[in-house]
From Swiss-Prot:
Gene Ontology MF terms in the entry: metal ion binding; tRNA-guanosine(34) queuine transglycosylase activity
Organism from which the protein derives: Citrobacter koseri (strain ATCC BAA-895 / CDC 4225-83 / SGSC4696)
Keywords tagged on the record: Glycosyltransferase, Metal-binding, Queuosine biosynthesis, Transferase, tRNA processing, Zinc
Free-text function comment from the UniProt entry: Catalyzes the base-exchange of a guanine (G) residue with the queuine precursor 7-aminomethyl-7-deazaguanine (PreQ1) at position 34 (anticodon wobble position) in tRNAs with GU(N) anticodons (tRNA-Asp, -Asn, -His and -Tyr). Catalysis occurs through a double-displacement mechanism. The nucleophile active site attacks the C1' of nucleotide 34 to detach the guanine base from the RNA, forming a covalent enzyme-RNA intermediate. The proton acceptor active site deprotonates the incoming PreQ1, allowing a nucleophilic attack on the C1' of the ribose to form the product.
Annotated family: Belongs to the queuine tRNA-ribosyltransferase family.
Ranges for region RNA binding: 245-251, 269-273
Protein name: Queuine tRNA-ribosyltransferase
Length: 375
């Protein structure tokens, strides 16, 4: 992988990630394909929304279908027939999400398989091996996602262990002869001094890109913005910056304003299945009765298949009848909305008009622009 940085506007960056499998224009949003599918979508449909890279889930694909079945097909690209690049998370966040049924030690994480209850163990080395078999174009180190809230002492211990795991991840990744990209993950909760130590330690190990982890886990938005404002300038400018698990459209806008290049989140797909649709002027809750006889498109400014062909009334009808097509059409729209938003941000950065774009984005939704505390 090669990262090319074209231009900046304030702290916002316009660039691209270049892979053997294709080019990803940045800032970029990555749809999430947890089990080897972006829920309800074919790879061709995902590509038609404008997505150039997707995310796969190491933890879930390890449990089902497992490494051996994956290798029978080649790798994850062959298994799911996605031709572009794939980023896989390390499994750390999913293990964190297991709560009481897992035990974290210096060696790794002991837990029970949520499918059948069998005891199972995951460590940095195993995570690197699974992601190698998946053929991931971007591999994430195995870390502990520090919960929120966490006091300073706990956050420090967690961050320091994640640094040790980062070195183990790097060593095993190199030992496998993996020629793809490996990203480090910055931890430290909401504490700037801990984030400083994490960034410094990761840069000393050396990675192809750096993710900001441990955000969007319940902390106030002000804390997320503050940490991004503090951390992003410390990440080497020639490396991509990835904000993990984020988020709402406004979170993408605020991340870009602070220097983030990459995002992923289940929100556009999950919300689509619940009839919660993102449009230029905000949000449409399509199951509400007011849409029952509305013949207008979901978003007059959207060029997606759904908006070009169907009315709000039809989408409302499908949702009320629990028709599978409704979830699919909603997903197509939400994914396209996110890609249109990213394309708009990229164009605004190119033209040096980002703050004008941001102002218009919030004005259309009747909301104030959040403060930006950067030099």
């Amino acid at each position: 992988m090669k990262f090319e940085l074209d231009t900046t506007d304030g702290r916002a960056r316009r660039g691209r990630l270049v892979f053997d499998r294709g080019v990803v224009e940045t800032p970029a949003f990555m749809p999430v394909g947890t089990y080897g599918t972006v829920k309800g979508m074919t790879p061709e449909e995902v590509e038609a929304t404008g997505a150039q890279i997707i995310l796969g889930n190491t933890f879930h694909l390890w449990l089902r279908p497992g490494q051996e079945i994956m290798k029978l097909h080649g790798d994850l690209h062959d298994f799911m027939q996605w031709k572009g690049p794939i980023l896989t998370d390390s499994g750390g966040f999913q293990v964190f999400s297991l709560g009481d049924i897992r035990k974290i030690t210096e060696q790794g994480v002991h837990f029970r398989n949520p499918i059948n209850g069998d005891p199972i163990f995951l460590d940095p080395e195993k995570s690197m091996e699974i992601q190698y078999d998946l053929g991931s174009d971007i591999v994430m180190i195995f870390d502990e996602c520090t919960p929120y809230p966490a006091d300073w002492d706990y956050a420090k211990r967690s961050m320091e262990m994640s640094l040790r795991w980062a070195k183990r991840s790097r060593d095993r990744f190199d030992g496998l002869g993996n020629k793809n990209a490996l990203f480090g993950i910055i931890q430290g909760s909401v504490y700037e001094d801990l984030r400083d130590i994490s960034v410094k330690g990761l840069v000393e190990i050396g990675f192809d890109g750096y993710a900001v982890g441990g955000l969007a886990v319940g902390e106030p938005k002000e804390d997320m913005h503050r940490i991004l404002e503090h951390v992003c300038p410390q990440i080497p400018a020639d490396k991509p910056r990835y904000l993990m698990g984020v988020g709402k459209p406004e979170d993408l806008v605020e991340g870009v304003r602070r220097g983030i290049d990459m995002f992923d989140c289940v929100m556009p797909t999950r919300n689509a299945r619940n009839g919660h649709l993102f449009v230029t002027d905000g949000v449409v809750k399509i199951r509400n009765a007011k849409h029952k006889s509305d013949t207008s498109p979901l978003d007059a400014e959207c060029d997606c298949y759904t908006c070009r062909n169907y009315s709000r009334a039809y989408l409302h009808h499908l949702d009320r009848c629990n028709e599978i097509l409704g979830a699919r059409l909603n997903t197509i729209h939400n994914l396209r909305y996110y890609q249109r938003l990213m394309a708009g941000l990229r164009k605004a950065i190119e033209e040096g008009k980002l703050e004008s774009f941001v102002t218009d984005f919030y004005q259309r939704q009747g909301r104030p622009v959040p403060p930006l505390n950067v030099d």
